[in-house]
Amino acid sequence: MDVGDMGDAGSNGRTSPAGRSLREYRQAPDCRHSDVHSRDTRLIPASPRGMNHEMASAHPTATAPASTQPVNIVPDPTVLASDLGKSFQRSAEEIVPWFVAQMPRMYFEDTSATEVANHLRAIIAARASGQPLHLTLHSDDRRQWTIIREGNKPGVLAEVVRSLPMSPSLRAAKIHGSKDGAIVLDTFEFGERSPFTGTTPEQTEKLKATIAFANSHAKDWTESAIRAYFAGCAADYIATLTPHRLNKHRLLLQSVSGSEGTAVETEPELEGQLTRMTIAFSNARARTMLERCAHVLSRGGINIQRAYLDQVADPPFGSVTMLGFVIQTQDGKSVDTSSAAWKQVAHDLTRIKWIDSESIWLANRHEGMTLDEAELILGLCTLSHQHLVHRDRLLFSIERILATAERTITITRQIADLFRARFNPAAPLDDAHFNKRAAALRADIGTKDDPEGTATILVALLDAVEATFRTNFFLAKRFGLSMRIDPSYLRDDRRPELPYGTFFVIGRGFFGFHNRFKEIARGGLRVVKPSNAAQHSRERERVFDEVYGLSWAQQQKNKDIPEGGAKAAILLEPESDITRCVKSFVDSLLDLITDDPAVRKQVVDRFGSRELIYLGPDENITPDHIEWIVSRARARKYAMPDAFMSSKPGAGINHKVYGVTSEGVNVFLEVALRARGIDPRKQPFTVKITGGPDGDVAGNMIRILDRDYGNNARIVGIADGSGVGEDPDGLDHTELLRLFKEALPIAKFDPKKLGKHGAVVPVEAPGGVMIRNTLHNRLKADAFIPGGGRPATINESNWRDYLTKDGKPSAPIIVEGANLFLTPGARKELFAAGCLIFKDSSANKCGVICSSYEIGASMLLDEKSFMPALKRNC
């Protein structure tokens, strides 16, 4: 079958050598309701038998006598239609028998007769017009895409899926390759699925058949459980699978339910030299997992003959994505699942949900590099960046570090290999042999010229290996890569105090640190989510600076409680999912501190001491995250799971519910106002706030200001991630309290509730970002409460912006509800300018004091005993 060559992406409006645009070639008969696209700009010329010879002879030749009559070059429409019909007929006579013979039986079972006819029309149209077979068909509502490509080889499916839209969500996929490998035909469905309801005769029959099957072959699968499973499935998913296959999927779902994990199962396929593989992913984006699995199979030299994708509900945990593949080796044989090559593929499939895209592309660029090795190299480079950034932020940017690691890939891989050897639980490298190999690497690095910092970067990578005490690298089902490192590795002039312990974690779309200044220390976990790449680039230079600064501030704040100071922060890439990254970070941390014997066997410990970590909620951590963290710690056999996380919604003292941090901030605010001659319970005063009504500190501050001072408290401005609300007469309290109760940001403030000089400006509005970012400087007020915002928002270089034209503070009182909003230098300058400032380590310490009591109680009481005590005292 001559279907031409596959090509690269083209664009409409280009012209073929014959002078016709590609748009003309893309019109397929009877496909008016589908968009048919060919991405190849090279067109195979029409064969001579397809030309209109009368038209050709109508053109004068060089020797023909001149004619005084005008030449009629308009073709006869009847003849032209006849020629085209014959061309399509010949193509149909060649293609249809081949198509029916070569497409697998399952294609015809999965595809309606109408869709089969549409697929054939598109293929015939491409063949008749001499196009390469590289087509995309869309349904009218664009909820179904069919992509037809020439040739079926490893990597084709991954390339196809990569071209699909990210929105709406992919809900189902069916992939079919012809038996001779000539074409692959992929159908993708997007948007909301049609659920199984059991109301049609076909659905009722399938339900009965499955119940009957279970009575004979799966007695643990009760009728009520079958009905519950079916209720979480799409109707076409149930219709497609046999009861036997549905039961297998049910068992796979159970194996990953609530775990965030992955299960891979293989079995021989009945027809030919094929292997069936089914993968279940807990709470994973369907499109991404299909692309990543196809990529892993391509790396392993595995051909995909058929593939299926569906999602099944997994209440209350979310959903499970089911991927089915019918595969074979490149030489047309079934897969040897006992081979080392396949075991590597299966391992990669198990972990692919959690591997960063950068690691995938790094492995692709270097033959023989595994995904685990690439992940390790990326991790060492990221950690080294935090080590080097203060020396020269441009010379040692993350981009230059990664480029250097790749440019000297041989020695980089030797460093990674040394890491693996040192922590290989089967035979860990002893100190003597490690030091010998490290010295040899240092000698090799020392011979390199260093005009661009090459040697410095490579030494930093090697130093990172030496600084690692513990890693989860060899855990087969880890959610990320974690290392317990010597904190002296990150010590420099800007971080002079030596912490007790530092953990580094990197995963898909994020990296972060946990840092503590005492063996037993407490501090929150925050998520930093930049809105764009430029902001992410700035934030990644200071991730450990932020963690260090916050944990040191916490150390000062905790002087009145037994625990020292700690903090954890995760920096997300702009498009990363917060919940996935939080789970990856926390689970990777648990890998290094759990008492589970099965885990400890795989973790070589060069620190030599058991460690306990105590977390609390901070920015972007929700009650659902808190509950998951505690339950996950329990499932992972952490020594004190109830004490692992404070501010628990159930058996805990939830900061947002009780407003414990804001209660303390308010005490300092009242004292400050009285010191300035304002009795807030009798006199009006104005206040501006950063942090939204949906936040813990700012939201509860709004509630407390209204509770204690009523209309005397005039909130003249609020800024949060969504925008600003400003009103010189004071924002309406009732509306602000509505936003607080409904957990809505300030941009949702009802404009009808504004005074005549008030305004709500979302960040999306022209100038909205600038207006939001300057509110704390622009507005005049009696007091300013930073209840949210990034560290160092007011710093040594911009503190003057906080002053009015006459050099006075725009608000003469600052009560720091948010940590590190002001740098020490800025704080000194503003104090000298007449600003009364209550520092974060004093003003907002009520939250951590409360958490200390909560965790102490959690160590002594179970939930049954804790809850009555909470109700009596709170």
Give the positions of each predicted feature.
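Glycine/serine-rich phosphate-binding loop and adjoining beta1-alpha1 elements at the start
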Residues: 547-683, 707
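Non-transmembrane, aqueous-exposed alpha-helical and coiled segments at domain scale
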Residues: 549, 577-578, 669-688, 705-714, ...
